[in-house]
Regions:
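Helix-loop-helix module between adjacent transmembrane segments
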Residues: 27, 31-32, 100-125, 131-195, ...
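Flexible loop linkers connecting adjacent transmembrane helices
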Residues: 37-61, 84-86, 90-94, 98, ...
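Select transmembrane alpha-helical segments in multipass membrane proteins
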Residues: 21-26, 61-69, 141-155, 185-186, ...
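Extracellular/periplasmic helix-exit of transmembrane alpha-helices
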Residues: 111-118, 220-238, 246, 250-253, ...
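Transmembrane helix-loop junctions in multi-pass membrane proteins
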Residues: 3, 35-39, 77-82, 158-168, ...
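Alpha-helical membrane segments and immediately flanking helix-loop junctions
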Residues: 56-88, 114-132, 136, 150-153, ...
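Membrane-interface loop-to-helix entry segments
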Residues: 23-30, 34-47, 166-172, 179-240, ...
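N-terminal alpha-helical transmembrane segments of multi-pass membrane transport
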Residues: 1-76, 86-93, 104, 396, ...
Length: 449
């Protein structure tokens, strides 16, 4: 097992080297400029996300699609992932993670647009879409579309399943002394009860769960920052300065480098918001929407909530707590978050427990849908039920697995998904601009396709 972990560590290091960082950030920046900074429409996007298009075609509402995407996106990457980035890359990783989210809004917009533009309608009226359909229908590259689908089906077991199940089991054991085997069995049953109902069941549960969990977590983080108010200025300075000058972090962070801060900040940023990975467009394609741009805007709002708000708050809580309480061990990402939050009496530990349990479970639900659609693309509908059984079983396995192995596997799969998806976005940018001009720039958002 250690040999496999060492191998995955090497592969992850290669995949997340400078070429990948340049490709991902380059795509974010290119689309930001090409689409005239779609970030400026973020509040319009938020308003659209709570509106319904009842006369539009699709399987779920725009909010249902967004809630499912957010459920899959807001997971341990927002809590443990941020802490791991800080432990490995220093406080500067928070800034890189945040920047990945800000510029990633443009990429998430582009993904959502292509999801609607290239989606297909099955014989039973179900909408299917995502990067695999964009690669096949937009570029004619079915071979690359199949590769993306395979990577997605496998990635679901990493970022969407075992990582999340492991986090739930760890929290349950450390907080309440519950055996990982018992936790794994319970989460298996809960997952099966929801995912067997299909996308509408998943969207319904996520639509109820996401607003509640996000509200309480954000409110709790704001309270902790209020308690740490005297250290916020120092935390901001440390995050910004150490992103470009690691020596500015001082203390135990001095071993980090700019490359490490960028690599782990960007990698965990992608893990957190999934902009450029190609996962969210799979459920965006099922949305009821009048035109591609409306759903593109709704999709982009997910990255704003996930990284610009939640990840930034988590990073500030951790860094300000480390400054306020120098005895915190920040060398281990898995324990850093718990140590930072536990320093806040009454609120810290319950908030972390609530956040990890709800965020992780919702991610398991959302990623099951992604994996199913990927399998359906390259193997056919008849394989979906078997995939569900394996996926639900993997929840139990993930509960008792080695965490380091799980994270390395997830990093590898994330990168392998992102590469073909980013290629499709760059090659099809002309279509993205054309649709944006047609509906957004000319003020025709209410016009149907």
């Amino acid at each position: 097992m250690q040999c496999l972990n060492d191998f995955l560590t090497e592969v992850s290091g290669l995949l997340w080297g400078w070429p990948m960082i340049i490709l991902l950030l380059g795509t974010h920046l290119f689309l930001t400029i090409r689409l005239r900074f779609p970030q400026r429409h973020i509040f319009k996007a938020i308003r659209l996300s709570v509106k319904r298009d009842p006369d539009a075609t699709g399987d779920v509402s725009q909010f249902g699609a967004l809630a499912t995407a957010l459920a899959a996106t807001i997971g341990t990457g927002n809590i443990i992932g941020v802490a791991t980035a800080i432990a490995l890359g220093g406080p500067g990783a928070v800034l890189w993670c945040w920047l990945t989210g800000v510029f990633g809004i443009a990429t998430k917009y582009a993904e959502g647009l292509l999801a609607i533009k290239c989606r297909v309608k099955t014989k039973n009226g179900k909408m299917l879409g995502g990067p695999m359909y964009a690669l096949e229908r937009g570029l004619g590259w079915r071979w690359l579309a199949i590769l993306f689908a395979v990577f997605t089906a496998l990635a679901a077991f990493g970022i969407g399943n075992t990582v999340q199940a492991n986090a739930i089991a760890t929290v349950a054991q450390e907080s309440y002394g519950v055996s990982p085997y018992i936790t794994g069995a319970i989460v298996c049953l809960l997952t099966g009860a929801v995912v067997l109902g299909g996308v509408k069941s998943i969207a319904r549960v996520c639509g109820m769960l996401v607003p509640v969990m996000a509200f309480f977590y954000v409110a709790g983080c704001v309270y902790i920052l209020f308690v740490n108010a005297d250290y916020l200025g120092a935390a901001f300075r440390m995050i910004v300065l150490s992103a470009f000058s690691p020596e500015a972090a001082g203390g135990g962070f001095v071993g980090s480098t700019v490359m490490m801060a960028a690599r782990f900040g960007i990698a965990r940023g992608l893990f957190s918001n999934e902009s450029g990975m190609g996962s969210a467009p799979i459920v965006a394609a099922a949305a009821q929407t009048k035109n591609p741009v409306r759903q593109a805007l709704v999709s982009s709002s997910g990255t704003f909530w996930d990284t610009v708000v939640i990840c930034a708050l988590t990073g500030l809580v951790i860094v300000s707590s480390v400054i306020a309480y120098p005895d915190i061990d920040f060398s281990n990402g898995a324990t850093l978050t718990k140590a930072a939050f536990s320093k806040i009496p009454y609120v810290g530990t319950p908030l972390l427990t609530f956040g990890l349990l709800t965020f992780s479970f919702s991610t398991i639900l959302g990623w099951c849908y992604y994996g199913e659609r990927a399998v359906e693309y390259f193997k056919g509908r008849q394989w979906v039920k078997g995939y569900r059984v394996i996926y639900i079983t993997a929840v139990f396995v993930g509960s008792v697995m080695n965490l380091a192995l799980v994270w390395n596997l997830a990093d590898c799969m994330n990168a392998l998904m992102a590469i073909p998806n980013l290629i499709s976005l760059l090659c099809l940018n002309g279509i993205i601009v054309h649709e944006t001009r047609k509906y957004l720039w000319k003020g025709r958002l209410d016009k149907a396709m």
